[in-house]
């Protein structure tokens, strides 16, 4: 049986892994487009749920699942939550996102 692990990455960890290395980023993008062209990527439209507030629908969260095949073979989902109220409140982020692979 394969042991499962959870690894939480902070922004610093992602940067250290090469996020700001444009050669590495472009190589990953090129590979992604190649796999997409071969039909190896499943990327359905996002599902959006609006959250009502006292005045109108100004907040929402989205789920964006995807699967990358080929030699990568990994599935994941991005959850994104946006709040107009947060955007008008100093000191807190407009949106909070999480990617699960």
Predicted regions: what is each one?
Residues 1-101:
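N-terminal ligand-binding/catalytic initiation module
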């Amino acid at each position: 049986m394969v042991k499962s692990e959870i690894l939480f990455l902070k922004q610093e960890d992602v940067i250290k892994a090469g996020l700001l290395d444009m050669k590495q980023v472009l190589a990953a993008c090129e590979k992604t487009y190649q796999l997409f062209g071969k039909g190896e990527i499943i990327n359905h439209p996002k599902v959006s749920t609006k959250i009502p507030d006292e005045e109108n629908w100004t907040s929402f969260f989205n789920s964006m699942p995807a699967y990358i095949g080929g030699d990568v073979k990994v599935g994941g989902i991005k959850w994104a939550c946006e709040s107009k109220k947060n955007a008008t409140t100093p000191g807190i982020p407009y949106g909070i996102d999480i990617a699960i692979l």
